[in-house]
Amino acid sequence: MTENVNEHTQGHLLGAADIRRIAADAGISPTKKFGQNFVIDPGTVRRIVREAGVTADDHVLEVGPGLGSLTLAILETGATMTAVEIDPPVAERLPKTIAEFMPDAVDRFRVVNRDALTVNPENLPDFKDDDSFTLVANLPYNVATPILLTLLERFDNLGTFLVMVQKEVADRLSEKPGSKIYGTPSVKLAWYGTAERVGVIGRNVFWPAPNVDSALVLFKRYPGGHTPAADNADGSVVDRETVFRLIDAAFGQRRKTLHAALKKIVPSEAFEKAGIDPTRRGETLTIDEFVALARALDEVFAS
């Protein structure tokens, strides 16, 4: 038992034999369409929950629960949780798995059969009244970044996340300016908070085994929901959409200078106001520098 295991929660986690039996009983096969690679190692899911710091007081969102390996490890802490699963047969089977392997957790669990890219506070009201909630997930590799940015945009109270993603994606999400892999995901995520890679996961803990290694990314949101640099003196906030538009344009032509990449939307006066050299490339700018450029752009157009 780890420190995250709630002493009042009875049950056990899924091993390889359990996963294969559940899949066979339900007629489920992992599909590339939904990026399904099911975790078959109890030690790995407990490690994820431990890194996430989940406790019995938490309300947890899981995206892509699959057959329930990580789900059971989260419930083992005593936490309350909602799982969003896109695949109907998998979503239908999940409550049965919880009832079989951890029956006393049934009342703390709900599954929603929906594409995570379509969720919002209206169609997923479970978290509406929470001051803050956490995301813990083994995300489908092909849509991991869009899911994270979509959830952060739509749920102001998504305070932290611990996700397992493809190692290459994890490196991009947590990278700093100046690197070849620093890009749109890195800088947009930095608008909301800080991210770091906190571990690497081998391929042999999955069924089927993926062709790439995985890694864990831990994210903590800024108290105000965005980088403090976006706060204006009058209490307003620099427009996020303007900042993201500049990011998209700068990285859309990342080998060009800022002057060349942004010439259609940023006049030279804005670079001057922001104190940013237009001969630099977008890949060298921090999120706070993109914010400064967006603020300067607003000031130029307002004058």
From Swiss-Prot:
Q: Which UniProt keywords apply?
A: Cytoplasm, Methyltransferase, RNA-binding, rRNA processing, S-adenosyl-L-methionine, Transferase
Alphabetical list of Pfam families matching this protein? RrnaAD (PF00398)
Q: Any transmembrane segments, and where? A: none
- Location in the cell: Cytoplasm
List ligand-binding residues for S-adenosyl-L-methionine. Answer: 37, 39, 64, 85, 115, 138
Report the EC number(s), separated by commas if there are several.
Answer: 2.1.1.182
The cross-references to SUPFAM superfamilies, in alphabetical order and at most eight, read: S-adenosyl-L-methionine-dependent methyltransferases (SSF53335)
Establish whether keyword Transferase is in the entry: yes
Q: What does this protein do?
A: Specifically dimethylates two adjacent adenosines (A1518 and A1519) in the loop of a conserved hairpin near the 3'-end of 16S rRNA in the 30S particle. May play a critical role in biogenesis of 30S subunits.
Family per UniProt? Belongs to the class I-like SAM-binding methyltransferase superfamily. rRNA adenine N(6)-methyltransferase family. RsmA subfamily.
What top-level branch of life does the organism fall under? Bacteria
The record, for InterPro entries, names: KsgA/Erm, rRNA_Ade_diMease-like_C, rRNA_Ade_Mease_Trfase_CS, rRNA_Ade_methylase_Trfase_N, rRNA_adenine_dimethylase, SAM-dependent_MTases_sf
Protein's name according to its UniProt entry: Ribosomal RNA small subunit methyltransferase A
Tell me the gene name: rsmA
List the record's Gene Ontology CC terms alphabetically: cytosol
SMART domains, sorted: rADc (SM00650)
What reaction(s) does this enzyme catalyze? adenosine(1518)/adenosine(1519) in 16S rRNA + 4 S-adenosyl-L-methionine = N(6)-dimethyladenosine(1518)/N(6)-dimethyladenosine(1519) in 16S rRNA + 4 S-adenosyl-L-homocysteine + 4 H(+)
Primary location group: cytoplasm
Quote one Gene Ontology molecular function term: RNA binding
User: What organism is recorded for this protein?
Assistant: Bifidobacterium adolescentis (strain ATCC 15703 / DSM 20083 / NCTC 11814 / E194a)
